[in-house]
Amino acid sequence: MTNNERIPSHVAIILDGNGRWAKQRGKTRSFGHKAGFDKVKDIASYASLRGIKALSLYCFSTENWNRPNQEVNFLMSIPIKFKEESKIYKEKNIKVIVSGRKDRIPKNTLDAMNDLVDDTKESTGMILNICFDYGSLNDLMNTINNLVENGTKLDEEKAIYSHLSTNPVGPVDLLIRTGGEKRLSNFLLIEAAYAELYFIDKYWPDFNNEDLDNAILEYSKRDRRYGGIKDE
C-alpha cells in the first residue's frame, strides 16, 4: 500500500479458472469449485480490511445451467456452505446480499442464501454481493419489464442503477477477471460501464491478497475521465 493509492469503492471479480485449476492437479471440476469457494472468505475478508465498500463476485451465471448436471448440482450446494460461514462474516462486519434470479434455484439452496443474508443484515461494513444465477442481460430485461409494467419513466441515465438487482452496490470501479480470459461474460454490463478492467492469468483458487493489492495499485494509476478530458 502506498500513500498515492486510491481504493476503489466497488470491486467486482469474475471467478474464473476453477475447473482448469483442478485439471492441472488431476482432480475433478468439483474439487476446483470447492477450492474456489474456500478462497471467497479469504479475499472478502482482505477486501474489507483494505477499505473496499462493496465486493461483487460472479459465482454462478445464467449460462452455467448448461454445464453437466453433476457439476451444476455441486455448484448448487455451495451456498449451503456459505451459510455455515455466516459467523465469519458477522465477526468482520460484512453484509451479504445476493443478486440474480431466484425462481430456478433449489429450495434448500435458496433458503441457505436467504439465511446468510438475514444473519448479516445488521452489519455496517463492506457489502459482499454474491451474484448467483445472475446474468446482466437478464437482469436488465427484468428491470425494463418492471419499469414498463409500473409505468415508471426514468429522467436520467444514472437512475437505472436503482432499479437493477445490484442496486445496493451500484456502479463498479474496478472489475477483475482471473483465469486469463479477457471478456466480461455478461457480468454487470451496466454497472461496469466505466469500470477499470484488470485481467490476471492466475486461476481463482490461486488468487491471493497480493494479487488484489496489485490490482488496486494498477487501478490507482489509471486516469478515469468518464469520456471527458483532464484539465490542461
Q: Where does each model-flagged region fall?
A:
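Flexible, compositionally biased loop and terminal segments
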Residues: 1-232
